[in-house]
Amino acid sequence: KRCLLVSYLPISGTNSKLVIVNLHLEAYDSGEGKAAQTRMLADILQNEAAAGNYVIAGGDFNQTFSNVDLSAYPQQSADLWAPGSIDVSEFGDSFTCITDSSAPTCRSLDKPYEGHDHESFQYYVIDGFIVSSNLQINSTETINLDFKNSDHNPIRLDVALK
């Protein structure tokens, strides 16, 4: 139902590639689909890193990373969709799961956003990146556009090759 787009970019002067995985994982399932997609993603990332490539996976995980403090975005109601959690240890020591929770990356779609009381709205941090250890993470930033264009805010990652 959802997808991964894997792109390979050559790195001049090396046999390695920068592997970019753009993703949108399952949201509305009982959990088995998300778990299977996460395992498949982990396998792809680990295989690419083992081949000596630089790897970044990023997008809408429709899950939260287990290493992120989400206390600023409590579940407002049991009636609203709640994301699952990705245990970041599933990706091993060769990867970092990272996002920026200083602003929400997503909002609920249960009611119109414009003109709504933003204090009682449901927010999530379900977008982010998984980065291989041969890349230096300089920064990650959620750009708070107040959901002007989408139900997601963009998130930016700045990395350098080690």
Mark where each language-model region is.
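Extracellular/periplasmic catalytic domains that process cell-envelope and extracellular macromolecules
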Residues: 1, 12-15, 49-50, 120-124, ...
